[in-house]
């Protein structure tokens, strides 16, 4: 127990000293999430010494010249002056801590410049569009020669800007290649001496190079050498294929971090029940106060569509952390689905007070406007979220839904594709793509995306119903029936599958199966006191089906049909007359 506490304390220092702030935050949360008994137990002198001691190859000794340079560089890093940080450590090659910080600072500087270039390009495109509009308006008033001169000047400016951007891209690419070659050589020649952090950074470079197999191999080596780096585990999860079987083949360290990884990975794969079991075990034994586990458990219940439990857990989370915004956009999804306008309005106002310009806040407000059917305002806030973080998955998916609502299919497709690029495991984006192609009357495309969604979420009846609808549209009835049966096996709350199965079996004249599903649907409708055309269809079919088998039952269905107006009522009367005439004939034919 105390060993876990020591490892977490040590990891906070190690991660923070390398600028891995998200991982450091995660370790801090788990440290504070330990049970009160473990936290209250004081550390011995030996344990305190083990926390501050570092391997000789890792950190420069206090008082050395490299240590002074590292302290200065770390301050530059914290102030996001990544180039200055890298410059200070340019000659520090003896210890692994300054090597990592220099490399990471260089990497972040390249990424920062890339993001700035994207913003500049977008601004230039907007400026060019505005200039084109202005020129079109002035074309009627100005002479043709002036127009030609203006076009030439604008084209020259555009060419110069493009040349500058191209030169910057080449320089960034060369810098990245140098960084990659340095780590590749280091790994080949000196892999045994590389610590877990240098291995983790090398895996980041491999991911950028799209060498995912090698990146996964290096990450496994990294978590073996240093298990308490959550970013390494998180990256490993993203590099594993969409099957839990691959985890069994990986050689992972026997460590408490492995349980967190497995729970996270299974949640990503929509194996929600298995994930929740692991989180429950962790929260019962060690991490009884972990808000991270509480949030993940709430998300798991949201994925399972247990919205009441998910809402309760999120409310408990907000009580513990009133100013928390992380994951609270998922809570807003629950309030949206449950049609709780007042609660969602209060949450949106609260989020605005906590942090106005935050992706989560923008998504919460977007959900609020979407619930009010103000789709233009919802789109505006989701776009703001994406300006703040262009890799914010929820915003891409939600803005796709909004574009779909206003029938802007091309924009919806673009948004869903962005979501899939960020996370290929996002079933909502695949499902959304299927819906967009349904609107375009392209059932084969739609079917492809719905099948992707069923692969990612095989226990969700909505995915199977959507795939079944496509098969039905292209008249592949046996495949449609199989999809609807899968939906029915997985508790189709909306009862779409039962109704469809009854009608499809009726269509192919398998009347016994049709009667089975019509009776089942009728039972649920009676239980929920639902009335409508599906009740009439079920009663009429069952009345006809049983008139030659069980006249009493057929009579009961006919009597219920008499309560409805329309042609079905007359047909019920006709069936009743037929039943009565048959019963009279049978009674006359009996021997006296």
From Swiss-Prot:
SMART domains given in the database record: TPR
Cellular location(s): Nucleus
Q: Which UniProt keywords apply?
A: Cell cycle, Cell division, Mitosis, Nucleus, Repeat, TPR repeat, Ubl conjugation pathway
- What is the scientific name of the source organism? Dictyostelium discoideum
- Biological process (GO) annotations? anaphase-promoting complex-dependent catabolic process; cell division; positive regulation of mitotic metaphase/anaphase transition; protein ubiquitination
Superkingdom of source: Eukaryota
The coiled-coil segments of this chain are none
Signal peptide region: none
- Pfam family name, one: TPR_11
Complex and partners: The APC/C is composed of at least 13 subunits that stay tightly associated throughout the cell cycle: anapc1, anapc2, anapc3, anapc4, anapc5, anapc6, anapc7, anapc8, anapc10, anapc11, cdc20, cdc26 and cdh1.
Alphabetical GO CC annotations of the entry are:
anaphase-promoting complex
Q: What is its main location?
A: nucleus
Q: Which named protein is this? A: Anaphase-promoting complex subunit 8
- InterPro entries the UniProt entry points to: APC8 (IPR007192), TPR-like_helical_dom_sf (IPR011990), TPR_rpt (IPR019734)
- Gene3D superfamilies given for it? Tetratricopeptide repeat domain
What function does the entry list?
Answer: Component of the anaphase promoting complex/cyclosome (APC/C), a cell cycle-regulated E3 ubiquitin-protein ligase complex that controls progression through mitosis and the G1 phase of the cell cycle.
Q: Where is this region: Disordered?
A: 129-166
Pathway involvement of the protein, from the record: Protein modification; protein ubiquitination
TPR repeat ranges per the UniProt record:
66-99, 160-193, 291-324, 359-392, 393-426, 428-460, 461-494, 496-528
Q: Write out the similarity annotation.
A: Belongs to the APC8/CDC23 family.
């Amino acid at each position: 127990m105390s060993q876990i506490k020591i490892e977490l304390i040590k990891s906070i220092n190690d991660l923070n000293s390398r600028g891995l702030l998200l991982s450091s935050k995660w370790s801090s949360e788990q440290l504070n999430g330990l049970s009160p008994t473990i936290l209250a137990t004081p550390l011995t002198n030996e344990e305190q010494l083990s926390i501050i001691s570092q391997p000789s190859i890792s950190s420069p000794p206090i008082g050395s010249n490299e240590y002074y340079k590292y302290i200065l560089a770390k301050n530059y890093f914290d102030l996001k002056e990544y180039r200055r940080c890298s410059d200070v450590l340019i000659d520090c090659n003896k210890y692994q801590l300054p090597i990592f910080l220099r490399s990471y600072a260089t990497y972040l500087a390249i990424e920062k410049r890339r993001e700035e270039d994207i913003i500049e390009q977008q601004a230039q495109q907007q400026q060019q569009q505005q200039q084109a509009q202005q020129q079109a308006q002035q074309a009627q008033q100005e002479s043709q020669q002036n127009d030609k001169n203006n076009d030439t000047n604008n084209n020259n400016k555009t060419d110069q800007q493009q040349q500058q951007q191209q030169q910057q891209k080449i320089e960034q690419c060369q810098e990245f290649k140098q960084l990659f070659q340095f780590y590749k050589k280091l790994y080949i020649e000196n892999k045994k001496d590389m610590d877990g952090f240098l291995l983790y950074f090398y895996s980041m470079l491999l991911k950028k190079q799209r060498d995912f197999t090698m990146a996964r191999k290096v990450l496994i080596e990294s978590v073996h050498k240093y298990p308490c780096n959550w970013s390494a585990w998180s990256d490993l999860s993203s590099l594993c294929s969409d099957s839990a079987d691959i985890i069994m083949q990986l050689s992972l360290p026997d460590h408490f971090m492995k349980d967190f990884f497995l729970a996270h990975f299974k949640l990503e794969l929509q194996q929600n029940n298995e994930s929740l079991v692991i989180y429950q075990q962790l929260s019962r034994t060690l991490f009884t106060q972990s808000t991270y586990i509480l949030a993940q458990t709430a998300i798991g219940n949201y994925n399972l569509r247990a919205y009441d439990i998910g809402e309760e857990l999120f409310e408990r989370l907000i009580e513990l952390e009133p100013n928390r915004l992380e994951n609270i956009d998922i809570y807003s999804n629950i309030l949206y689905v449950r049609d709780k306008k007042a609660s969602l309005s209060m949450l949106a106002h609260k989020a605005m007070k906590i942090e106005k310009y935050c992706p989560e806040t923008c998504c919460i407000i977007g959900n609020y406007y979407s619930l009010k059917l103000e789709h233009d305002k919802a789109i505006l806030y989701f776009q703001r979220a994406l300006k703040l973080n262009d890799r914010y998955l929820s915003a891409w998916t939600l803005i796709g839904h909004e574009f779909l609502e206003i029938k802007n299919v091309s924009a919806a497709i673009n948004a869903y594709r962005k979501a899939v690029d960020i996370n290929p495991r996002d079933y909502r984006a695949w499902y959304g793509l299927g819906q967009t192609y349904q609107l375009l009357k392209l059932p084969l495309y739609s079917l492809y995306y719905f099948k992707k969604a069923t692969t990612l979420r095989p226990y969700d009846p909505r995915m199977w119903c959507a795939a079944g609808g496509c098969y039905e549209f292209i008249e592949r009835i046996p495949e449609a029936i199989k999809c609807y049966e899968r939906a029915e096996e997985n508790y189709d709350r909306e009862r779409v599958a039962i109704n469809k199965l009854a009608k499809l079996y009726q269509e192919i004249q398998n009347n016994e199966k049709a009667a089975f599903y019509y009776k089942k649907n009728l039972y649920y409708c009676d239980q929920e006191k639902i009335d409508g055309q599906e009740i009439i269809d079920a009663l009429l079919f069952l009345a006809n089906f049983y008139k030659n088998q069980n006249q009493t039952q057929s009579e009961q269905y006919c009597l219920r049909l008499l309560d409805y107006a329309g042609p079905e009522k007359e047909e019920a009367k006709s069936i009743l007359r037929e039943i009565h005439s048959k019963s009279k004939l049978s009674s006359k034919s009996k021997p006296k």
